[in-house]
Amino acid sequence: MARSKSSNRWLEEHVNDPFVKQAQQDGYRSRASYKLLEINNKDRLIKPTDLVVDLGSAPGGWSQVAAKLVGHKGRVVASDILPMDPIAGVEFIQGDFTEQEVFDQIMAILDGARADVVISDMAPNISGVNAADQAASMYLVELALDMACQVLKPKGSFVAKVFHGEGYDEYVKTVRESFDKVVIRKPDSSRARSREVYLVAKGFRVA
């Protein structure tokens, strides 16, 4: 079966992508690791001893970065519907965190502790229908925000991938209602033609 032009373009980009090559050299599971590293270098979100919750963590690129940043005295709790190979210093729960059973497992691992940072690089499976894909991506990021508001400690931080499109402006407005400072980042490691940006929210205000 012949590849489509778009899949050929993706393959060519992937093969020639310097961040893909760098990830292989550095032992990261995906190029996405550099997005979190860039964001953290600018915004100083994750610090040694922090407790980080990683939503939609597979294959583990962000969890790897978070584990290095928090060090052996910190904790990373990760969750994804998909399986994820073990990472030293990361406690992983497979399942949908919106389901009560999985949510309860996460809360049990946290054991009353509140997260310093919640991170989410979640994205839906792309159908190619822009309206449907945008709706699906906004749904995921709304779920991530809801989860963050349930587990963050006061003054905690939240980072999530968001796609420009319908619902974007309203979402940013909603996040501002719960955090002292909200900025939008477009890391160098994010492909220029991608509509993705990263919302960085600091200073969580507990309702």
Curated annotation (Swiss-Prot):
Organism from which the protein derives: Marinobacter nauticus (strain ATCC 700491 / DSM 11845 / VT8)
Class of this enzyme: transferase
Main location: cytoplasm
Lineage summary: Bacteria, Pseudomonadati, Pseudomonadota, Gammaproteobacteria, Pseudomonadales
Catalyzed chemical reaction(s): uridine(2552) in 23S rRNA + S-adenosyl-L-methionine = 2'-O-methyluridine(2552) in 23S rRNA + S-adenosyl-L-homocysteine + H(+)
Localization, UniProt: Cytoplasm
Protein name: Ribosomal RNA large subunit methyltransferase E
Cytoplasm in keyword set: yes
Listed transmembrane segments: none
Catalytic center residues: K161 (proton acceptor)
EC nos: 2.1.1.166
Similarity comment: family membership: Belongs to the class I-like SAM-binding methyltransferase superfamily. RNA methyltransferase RlmE family.
Top-level taxon of the source organism: Bacteria
GO CC annotation: cytoplasm
InterPro entries to which the protein is assigned, alphabetical: RNA_methyltr_RlmE, RNA_MeTrfase_FtsJ_dom, rRNA-MeTfrase_E, SAM-dependent_MTases_sf
Binding site for S-adenosyl-L-methionine: G60, W62, D80, D96, D121
Functional description taken from the UniProt entry: Specifically methylates the uridine in position 2552 of 23S rRNA at the 2'-O position of the ribose in the fully assembled 50S ribosomal subunit.
Keywords: Cytoplasm, Methyltransferase, rRNA processing, S-adenosyl-L-methionine, Transferase
Pfam family, one: FtsJ
Membrane listed as a keyword: no
